[in-house]
Curated annotation (Swiss-Prot):
The gene is hup1. It comes from Halalkalibacterium halodurans (strain ATCC BAA-125 / DSM 18197 / FERM 7344 / JCM 9153 / C-125). It holds the Pfam family Bac_DNA_binding. This is DNA-binding protein HU-1. Homodimer. SMART domains: BHL. GO terms for biological process: chromosome condensation. It comes from the Bacteria. Histone-like DNA-binding protein which is capable of wrapping DNA to stabilize it, and thus to prevent its denaturation under extreme environmental conditions. Disulfide bonds: none annotated. GO terms for cellular component: cytosol. Residues 55-90 are annotated as: Disordered. The modification Phosphothreonine is found at residue 4.
Length: 90
C-alpha cells in the first residue's frame, strides 16, 4: 500500500472526500515527523510507537578500496509495533 492507496482507504472508511482524507493523512505524518524532530516519542496505544534511535559512530570499510573509514553517528526513526497490531498480523 502506498500513500495514494492509504488516502483512498481512509476516505472510504471515514466517509470523507479524497481531498479531506489527504489532508488528514498529511496532518498525521507531519505531526509524527514534528514530534520526532523535537526528540519526542509518539505512542499510539494498540498500534505501536515511533521514536528516534541514535546510532553511534563506528568504523567501516570502503568496499571498493578496502580502506577503513569512520562512519559518523546518526539518528534514525524507528517503529515498534504494539501488541494489537502484532496479533492482527499473526
Amino acid at each position: 500500500m502506498n500513500k495514494t492507496d492509504l488516502i483512498n482507504a481512509v476516505a472510504e472508511q471515514a466517509e470523507l472526500s479524497k481531498k479531506d482524507a489527504s489532508k488528514a493523512v498529511d496532518a498525521v505524518f507531519e505531526s509524527i515527523t514534528g514530534a520526532l524532530k523535537e526528540g519526542g516519542k509518539v505512542q499510539l496505544v494498540g498500534f505501536g510507537s515511533f521514536e528516534v534511535r541514535e546510532r553511534s559512530a563506528r568504523k567501516g570499510r570502503n568496499p571498493q578500496t578496502g580502506e577503513e573509514i569512520e562512519i559518523p553517528a546518526t539518528k534514525n526513526p524507528a517503529f515498534k509495533p504494539g501488541k494489537q497490531l502484532k496479533d492482527a498480523v499473526n
